[in-house]
């Protein structure tokens, strides 16, 4: 909107990498892919590849002004996305989304300079729908008139799966946790 209360942003990036079979095996074995995992179904290691392509996309909605707060995003990084030539790559093969709502009090009262409370949900999986994170979180903080503050954070994570803890081995179940 023209007041920039609500802002929608997004991006789409593509990548294409080619090279020798040995080079592509190295790319497939990177910690952000682990295509050599024995239980990998979607895009497993292919020793005959001489090129790989992928994409990154993310869309975000943010309510920036006012006391009521909303932030939501959905992002996708395909298993073949490769941008390591630009710097340091630390993820691929991810689908992530979150929704955060909250309320912020900016006007001081008799005790607090400002206060806020946020409740959110997030979920991250890969292209095989191995859920690596799914949970709720609560964040609350207050700032006293003397500029001291207190923050409280808690979260509950549902049972999930790690495809990286064994560094290319089989996936592991992670119990729910607080």
Report each predicted region and the residues it spans.
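Hydrophobic, small-residue-rich alpha-helical packing segments that form membrane-like cores
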Residues: 1-3
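Exposed, low-structure sequence patches enriched in small/polar residues
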Residues: 5-178
């Amino acid at each position: 909107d023209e007041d920039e209360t609500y802002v929608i942003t997004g991006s789409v990036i593509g990548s294409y990498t080619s090279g020798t079979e040995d080079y592509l095996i190295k790319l497939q074995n990177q910690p952000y892919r682990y295509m050599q995992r024995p239980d990998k179904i979607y895009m497993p290691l292919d020793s005959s590849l001489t090129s790989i392509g992928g994409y990154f996309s993310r869309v975000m909605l943010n309510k920036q002004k006012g006391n009521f707060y909303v932030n939501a995003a959905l992002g996708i990084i395909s298993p073949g996305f490769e941008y390591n030539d630009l710097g340091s790559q630390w993820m691929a093969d991810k689908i992530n989304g979150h929704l955060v709502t909250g309320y912020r009090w900016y006007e001081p009262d008799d005790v607090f300079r400002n206060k806020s409370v946020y409740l959110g949900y997030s979920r991250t999986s890969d292209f095989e729908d191995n859920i690596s994170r799914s949970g709720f979180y609560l964040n609350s903080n207050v700032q006293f008139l003397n500029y001291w503050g207190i923050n409280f954070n808690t979260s509950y994570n549902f049972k999930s799966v790690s495809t990286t803890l064994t560094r290319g081995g089989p996936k592991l179940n992670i119990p729910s946790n607080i």
